UniProtKB/Swiss-Prot annotation:
Top-level taxon in the UniProt lineage: Eukaryota
Predominant cellular place of this UniProt entry's protein: nucleus
Single GO cellular component term: nucleus
Key word Transferase present: no
Protein known as: DDIT3 upstream open reading frame protein
Transmembrane segments: none
Record-level GO BP terms: artery development; calcium ion import; cell redox homeostasis; diaphragm contraction; endoplasmic reticulum unfolded protein response; ER overload response; gene expression; intrinsic apoptotic signaling pathway in response to endoplasmic reticulum stress
Gene name of the encoded protein: Ddit3
Localization of this protein: Nucleus; Cytoplasm
Biological source species: Mus musculus
One GO MF term attached to the UniProt entry: DNA-binding transcription factor activity
Keyword entries, A-Z: Cytoplasm, Nucleus
Summary of subunit composition and partner proteins: Interacts with DDIT3 (isoform 1).
Amino acid sequence: MLKMSGWQRQSQNNSRNLRRECSRRKCIFIHHHT
């Protein structure tokens, strides 16, 4: 539960960084969590 809460909060702030990095794991994680 805490992880979900943190992810949602970070997703907004890291959404830009994650998209830029778009690592293989991150890309899959985002695609599977979007």
